[in-house]
């Protein structure tokens, strides 16, 4: 008993003192950051379904470090670095989140589940009503996804790392996770955390960007519709989804799990399977998103901050989202010119594929300047196109980048 000291008895404190001031400072910072995320999630400033479990995971993993039997520092949550099969099987019986991580996270399954749920939210009828405008705006809103690659390469990142962080500009968390797992697995944790942190800020940040770049007289434009938009029945939407899924899987088989998951969600929505729809759009989507937040949180141990690339990723993430927002607004102005003034440029911001947040942002801004202007239908069309376009770019990057 006399050999048991305070540091041995309370190993969280003991490992803090034994790990050196740099690692200890990083652990303290991440604990404070986790508490901040919990607070911001509770206040509704960030997405609570992701940020609260992520923040609590950060707190627990950095407080719950202990000394393992071999003398190294570890935890009882999970070990993402395991590759030996026997060691992995042993750890899965000890670390309670290791089975969840190994069987759903590291293979992209959880990202596909989230994407399947997103598919149930998409009414492709809005895209079919104005396909040219929707697709054009979506392409413009990928400006950050394209331009961030050379910027990141200039800052010293490899091409695979650059493409992974550039996908933050697509404003779709599962897409970022899927791409980084395929191209830069050693950086998928910081890249995905950066993506979800910044995506939570789009609802609060993009309105300022729109107001900066779009004068009030343009924001207040009320679009005149000469004829009522055509309503497509479920049969057409289902056929469209099936054909597009087949084409995209044929062209980019490496990203076919994403395409399949997205359009399966759309098919469930349009096929009238109410009980399956309720499951996929509810428990599956929200449960997967919640567990994604949990896993991202417990993966944020102190070594994350010690990676010299983390600062670059933080900067590049915000640059990618900023450029994508600017690109979408530029596309809105081009459509304004093409339509000879009968188009509201604010719709361009909705092409950034954070479903349905950016579409709501567009309508909220427009309604504030002109309560009689309704752009939500056009905004949702651009929004849905943005999701599909981001998935296509993911397929292009994963297919082409390894050969460059």
Predicted regions and their residues:
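Intrinsically disordered, low-complexity non-transmembrane regions of multi-pass membrane transporters
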Residues: 1-22, 28, 75-93, 208-239, ...
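Interfacial helix-loop-helix linkers and transmembrane-helix boundary segments
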Residues: 43-51, 99-101, 122-135, 274-283, ...
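Entry/N-cap segments of selected transmembrane alpha helices
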Residues: 24, 124-149, 196, 303-329, ...
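Transmembrane helical segments that form the transport core of multi-pass membrane transport proteins
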Residues: 243-331
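Alpha-helical transmembrane segments
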Residues: 187-204, 316-327, 347-350
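Hydrophobic transmembrane alpha-helices of secondary-active transporters
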Residues: 37, 102-128, 266-268, 285-307
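Membrane-embedded hairpin module used as a gating/binding unit in multi-pass transport
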Residues: 195-273
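Alpha-helical membrane segments and immediately flanking helix-loop junctions
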Residues: 103-108, 116-121, 135-147, 151, ...
């Amino acid at each position: 008993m006399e050999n048991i000291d305070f540091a041995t008895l309370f190993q969280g404190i003991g490992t803090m003192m034994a790990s050196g001031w740099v690692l200890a400072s990083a652990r303290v910072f991440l604990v404070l950051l986790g508490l901040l995320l919990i607070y911001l999630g509770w206040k509704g400033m960030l997405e609570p379904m992701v940020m609260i479990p992520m923040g609590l995971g950060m707190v627990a993993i950095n407080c719950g470090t202990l000394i393992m039997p071999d003398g190294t520092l570890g935890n009882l949550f999970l070990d993402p670095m395991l590759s030996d099969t026997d060691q992995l099987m042993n750890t899965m019986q000890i670390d309670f989140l290791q089975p969840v991580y190994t069987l759903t996270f590291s293979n992209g399954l959880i990202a596909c589940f989230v994407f399947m749920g997103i598919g149930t939210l998409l009414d492709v009828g809005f895209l079919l009503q104005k396909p040219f405008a929707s697709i054009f705006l979506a392409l413009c809103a990928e400006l950050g996804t394209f331009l961030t690659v050379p910027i990141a390469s200039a800052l010293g990142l490899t091409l695979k790392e650059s493409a992974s962080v550039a996908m933050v500009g697509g404003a779709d968390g599962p897409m970022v996770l899927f791409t980084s797992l395929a191209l830069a697995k050693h950086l998928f944790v910081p890249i995905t955390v950066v993506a979800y942190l910044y995506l939570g800020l789009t609802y609060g940040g993009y309105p300022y960007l729109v107001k900066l770049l779009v004068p009030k007289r343009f924001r207040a434009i009320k679009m005149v519709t000469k004829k009522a938009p055509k309503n497509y029945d479920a049969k057409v939407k289902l056929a469209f989804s099936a054909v597009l899924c087949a084409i995209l899987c044929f062209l980019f088989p490496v990203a076919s799990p994403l395409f399949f998951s997205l359009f399966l969600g759309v098919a469930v929505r349009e096929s009238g399977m109410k009980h399956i729809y309720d499951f996929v759009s509810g428990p599956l989507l929200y449960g997967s998103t919640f567990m994604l937040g949990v896993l991202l949180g417990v993966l944020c141990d102190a070594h994350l901050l010690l990676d010299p690339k983390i600062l670059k990723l933080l900067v590049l993430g915000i640059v990618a989202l900023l450029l994508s927002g600017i690109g979408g607004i530029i596309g809105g102005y081009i459509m304004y010119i093409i339509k000879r003034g009968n188009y509201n440029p604010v719709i361009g911001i909705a092409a950034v594929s954070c479903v349905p947040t950016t579409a709501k942002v567009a309508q909220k801004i427009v309604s504030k300047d002109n309560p009689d202007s309704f752009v939500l239908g056009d905004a949702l069309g651009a929004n849905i196109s943005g999701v599909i376009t981001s998935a296509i770019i993911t397929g292009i990057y994963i297919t082409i980048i390894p050969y460059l």
